[in-house]
Amino acid sequence: MSKVTTVFIGALVLLLLIENGFSCTNPGKKRCNAKCSTHCDCKDGPTHNFGAGPVQCKKCTYQFKGEAYCKQ
């Protein structure tokens, strides 16, 4: 059972690294809802206030027809 748990935790860590990526050498600094291709395009972008305080969009998520947009 401990091997299964170790493999599961390792897989979760790997997925987090893939989703969030490693450090960006040249952040794109795009705003929220801007088109992007990787999370580095959105990193260090301007903060926005959507009514719940300042938010910085850091993730590049796919939504429509394979197009990706910067989201929080």
UniProtKB/Swiss-Prot annotation:
GO terms for molecular function: toxin activity. Residues 1-22 form the signal peptide. The keyword Disulfide bond applies. Expressed in salivary glands. Disulfide bonds join 24-40, 32-57, 36-60, 42-70. It is found in: Secreted. GO terms for cellular component: extracellular region. It comes from the Eukaryota. Probable neurotoxin. This is Holocyclotoxin-1.
